[in-house]
Amino acid sequence: MTTFDDRENAFENKFAHDAEMQFKAEARRNKLLGLWAAELLGKTGDEAAAYAVEVVKSDFEEAGDEDVYRKVSGDLGDKADEITIRTKMRELLVEAKAQIMSEIK
């Protein structure tokens, strides 16, 4: 194997790792978002956990975050506006990445 082959394999492995980490972070963010929204909806315990799973599943409808936003926004109605939800999504993505990194160490 040449140095170029080694380098190519390293780049492919890094790309796959980064994609996996991003997927895990977004799934974790969606779960945290679901738990946050469930609290606003007055759900607790198993009902809140089930709602969080619904939010995670909503992300598989299309690429990007719009499907998750639509789900949460539609469910919350006037309990949270667009800016609040989108800001919470960004905050929770940072939190999710930090949680995942702390689990790796």
Roles of regions detected by a PLM:
Residues M1-K105:
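A charge-rich, low-complexity, intrinsically flexible signal that marks solvent-exposed coils, linkers
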